Amino acid sequence: MRGSVFGFVPSFRIRFFASSTHIIDTMKTLQEYLSASHAPEDLGKIIMMIADQAGPIRSAFISNQNYAGSTNSSGEDQAEMDTWADTRITSVLQESGLVRSIASEEQEDITEMSPSAKYSVVMDPLDGSSLIKVNLTVGTIVGIYEGDVLQAGNKLRAAFYMLYGPLTTLTISLGNGVSIFAMNEEGTYVLLKENVRIPEGTLCGSGGLRPEWTEKHIQYMNAIECEGGKNRYSGSFVADFHQILEYGGVYAYPATKKSASGKLRLVFEINPIGFLAVQAGGAVSNGESSTLEIVPTKVHQRTPVYVGSKGMIAKIEAIR
């Protein structure tokens, strides 16, 4: 049997998957999960509104595979899908009246929306968008704060990402563990796995060109390779992290000789993913201490990142 062309999973396949692997005992939708978690009503609505954009975003891949001829605030070329997904999600949140402000990797500044609203959203609308042309996995990364945008990652009320691969999945935490859902053929997110934990593993993926690595990072990667570490790096942060979440190991985008701040953005990428990692029993660090404790001073602030199994993160912090 096959899923639909958009990567949805027929509900009968999910039931078989759940019963045959004993991952879950009963079926639960994302909406039911939010209710059972006692998520505040407005927070739950914001999560569902963004989650519901996965189908339209994935459907738009076919007709939006080129570059848009523009750059984002970080100076990176924008793919058509970057701007399409950003506009789509921003418009939905603007119309809802439930969001105070939004910060997106594809927007130069924080966009103010409804001043009386309780929550603010940070997002990378389409992480890894350059991989769409070669049909590799990409995703949408989201964090939600109570109050304003520029807060430490440990203040997040919710973090999740949608992954557009063979399945369309949503991995989420409200601060009480991590759960993974998959979209079925009806567009409903059904629970695949709950209480997800990052095992100690040997997968490793590192960004940056090797000649530009610092001595500290070279020492770290050499040690991993000597211990049998297996390299996994696709160019999509969210896809590479999902492998680490499942199998254990570390994803790194370190400080380099050219950029002491690394490449990834603290607000849109590192904080939501780091929050999920910690909720799954893992850790996140800039190589010295937790990135979740950093209070950003600007929306496009960058920082080096190591995220994954606790043991892997302890090793990089131990190198002086």
UniProtKB/Swiss-Prot annotation:
Q: Which species is the source of this protein?
A: Methanocorpusculum labreanum (strain ATCC 43576 / DSM 4855 / Z)
Location within or outside the cell = Cytoplasm
- What GO cellular component term, any one, is given? cytoplasm
Q: Gene3D superfamilies annotated for this entry?
A: 3.40.190.80, Fructose-1,6-Bisphosphatase, subunit A, domain 1
Lineage, opening ranks: Archaea, Methanobacteriati, Methanobacteriota, Stenosarchaea group, Methanomicrobia
Superkingdom of the source species: Archaea
In which pathway is this protein known to take part? Carbohydrate biosynthesis; gluconeogenesis
Cofactor-binding details, from the entry: Binds 2 magnesium ions per subunit.
Where is Mg(2+) 1 annotated to bind? 105, 124, 126
Q: What's the cofactor?
A: Mg(2+)
What is this protein identified as?
Fructose-1,6-bisphosphatase class 1
